[in-house]
Curated annotation (Swiss-Prot):
Its EC number is 7.1.1.2. It holds the Pfam family NADHdh. This is NADH-ubiquinone oxidoreductase chain 1. Core subunit of the mitochondrial membrane respiratory chain NADH dehydrogenase (Complex I) that is believed to belong to the minimal assembly required for catalysis. Complex I functions in the transfer of electrons from NADH to the respiratory chain. The immediate electron acceptor for the enzyme is believed to be ubiquinone. The gene is mt:ND1. One of its GO terms (cellular component) is mitochondrial inner membrane. One of its GO terms (molecular function) is NADH dehydrogenase (ubiquinone) activity. It is found in: Mitochondrion inner membrane.
Length: 314
């Protein structure tokens, strides 16, 4: 009984903490963008604007839920819910030492969840029955699939080195030296791929205001929009955490881990405040002509390195 209840309580606490983290990430983003644009940002609600995200949530969920006449009702309503469910499910592969869930195949679980995330975007765009939403959805799907290839290859090259699919072994492996020191180009590729994967500036083509209004979520209002928004920011937070686990290997219980996590999240926001939007064809060229060859080369290098070390031992 106790063994059955503890993982449930642990996962519930995790979901609550992620939601609170996402709320304050939006506040951090608005504050940082405010200071980048030489203004204050939110500072009225609560002490220095601390309660702003909660008032935003109340405002969004109390608004009227519109229903486009031509939309496919069930898929239109369930795609944001499924999107949020997937982005919260990915958090289960965090390398916890406590008795939550033991994931020996955490890397594969992460790749499966991110691949499934494509369908929610596609269905959200298609079920709205709006041309703009469909175009935004198609762009987002093409972009996500393109950058998932380089993400998977980078992870595969590290798996060859670490020899395990568990994220916990990444932390044990980097006791003496971080991966970022001898794989710096790979770290930059991973960061750029994360930006593309989460549809962030400079790769936010699903939301090109000048052409597609707001992208695949253009027909969503109040609750549906809030769920898509939560899913996006939850995946940003998770990608930042994954960058820290893979490249800046630190103990998940140390204060330094959360300091690094905050810094990587800040980089996501900083990039949004400073870089203009990329061109769509250049985005695709970047994925297939630059990132793919680089990650493949690193993969071959790591395989060769592993074979070399094994041949030295035996």
């Amino acid at each position: 009984m106790f063994d059955g209840i503890m993982p449930l309580i642990g996962s519930l606490l995790l979901v609550i903490c992620v939601m609170v983290g996402v709320a304050f990430l939006t506040l951090l983003e608005r504050k940082v963008l405010g200071y980048i644009q030489i203004r204050k940002g939110p500072n009225k609600v609560g002490f220095n604007g601390l309660l702003q995200p909660f008032s935003d949530a109340v405002k969004l969920f109390t608004k009227e839920q519109t229903y486009p006449l031509l939309s496919n009702y069930i898929s239109y309503y369930f795609s944001p819910v499924f999107s949020l469910f997937l982005s919260l499910l990915i958090w289960m592969c965090i390398p916890y030492l406590i008795k939550l869930y033991s994931f020996n195949l955490g890397v594969l679980f992460f790749l499966c969840c991110t691949s499934l995330g494509v369908y929610t975007v596609m269905i959200a765009g298609w079920s709205s029955n709006s041309n703009y939403a469909l175009l935004g959805g198609l762009r987002a799907v093409a972009q996500t699939i393109s950058y998932e290839v380089s993400l998977a290859l980078i992870l595969l090259s590290f798996i060859f080195l670490v020899g395990n699919y568990n994220f916990l072994s990444f932390y044990f492996y980097q006791d003496y030296v971080w991966f970022i020191f001898f794989c710096f180009p790979l770290g930059l590729v991973w960061l750029a791929s994360c930006l593309a994967e989460t549809n962030r500036t400079p790769f936010d083509f699903a939301e090109g205001e000048s052409e597609l209004v707001s992208g695949f979520n253009v027909e969503y209002s109040s609750g549906g929009f809030a769920l898509i928004f939560l899913a996006e920011y939850s995946s940003i937070l998770f990608m930042s955490m994954l960058f820290v686990v893979i490249f800046l290997g630190s103990d998940i219980y140390s204060f330094m881990f959360f300091l690094k996590l905050s810094f990587i999240s800040f980089i996501f926001i900083w990039v949004r405040g400073t870089l203009p939007r990329f061109r769509y064809d250049k985005l695709m060229y970047l994925a297939w002509k630059s990132f793919l060859p680089l990650s493949l080369n690193y993969l071959f290098f790591f395989v060769g390195l592993k074979i070399f070390f094994i041949s030295l031992l035996f």
